[in-house]
Amino acid sequence: KIPMTAMPELVAGFHSLVGLAAVFVAIAAFLNPGAFNLGSPGNIKLGSLIEMSIGAAVGAITFSGSIIAFLKLQGIMSGSPITFKGQHPLNALILISIIVLTYLLCSTQSLNLFWFLLAVSFLIGFLIIIPIGGADMPVVISMLNSYSGWAAAGIGFTLENTALIITGALVGSSGAILSYIMCKGMNRSFINVILGGFGATDQSSNSQNKEQKPVKNGNAEDAAFLMKNASSVIIVPGYGMAVAQAQHALREMVDTLKKNNIKVSYAIHPVAGRMPGHMNVLLAEANVPYDEVF
């Protein structure tokens, strides 16, 4: 019952649950390592402790980051970038503190350090997402997808679960590759995405014209009539098609053009819509042939 336009929020919610599950498993393993064959409290195997710490940290970052992404997409929180002076140095300091805390935790196996590591990880997940604008959320969703995969893989090592390791690694690597491709399509830096270093606002929402203007209604045949003299047409669908649920009307227009021997194809930008593959799914709903999409 979730509309396609609300799918990014749903995906962000699922990512948050994956991250939270990784955190809970790490907590259970740290408090009761004997149940997972990791040793005894205060005497956990070093390798398992490193895996546990990394899985818990990445899981916490995924959880808090996904919650912020959900709030931004849902409109509960402003979709505009939220920045403040010294934000990047603070993020760098927190990331360094996570590394230091992980080292100290492996050395002392202190419960207080473990809780502090989780708290700091939750904080950095919040801080790296708030400066990203709503127009860039497709990249954020893909990046959080990657984070959730690595969190699952880290916990898979802790639990010695091969299936979880393989699945998490596949999700993590595919999400990272997709994020890189999307960043190239947007002319943005992949490193800045990881560090939460960019935040283009959605100009269409920030500069809305309040003036009321007349609306000209038309159907698929009217649109096709305007292009009747063309020999080839390339359609570039966007988020407006998703909001209006116009993919079926678009297909009707294309069918009319084809009857007039006009070649039609679809060009989809890597970050069109509000999540990766958004436009592809909508066109598939309208039974658009896949070989016409590029």
Q: Where do the PLM segments sit?
A:
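Transmembrane alpha-helix boundary signature
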Residues: 1-7, 23-40, 108
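C-terminal ends of transmembrane helices
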Residues: 1-11, 66-81, 124-137, 179-183
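Cytoplasmic-side transmembrane-helix entry/capping segments in multi-pass membrane proteins
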Residues: 5-18, 81-93, 138-147
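Membrane-interface helix termini and inter-helical loops of multi-pass transporters
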Residues: 32-46, 75-80
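Alpha-helical transmembrane segments
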Residues: 46-62, 168-174
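Mobile "lid/hinge" segments at catalytic clefts and subdomain interfaces of large enzymes
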Residues: 133, 147-191
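Membrane-interfacial segments at transmembrane helix termini in multi-pass membrane proteins
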Residues: 170-230
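Structured cytosolic domains appended to multi-pass membrane proteins
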Residues: 211-294
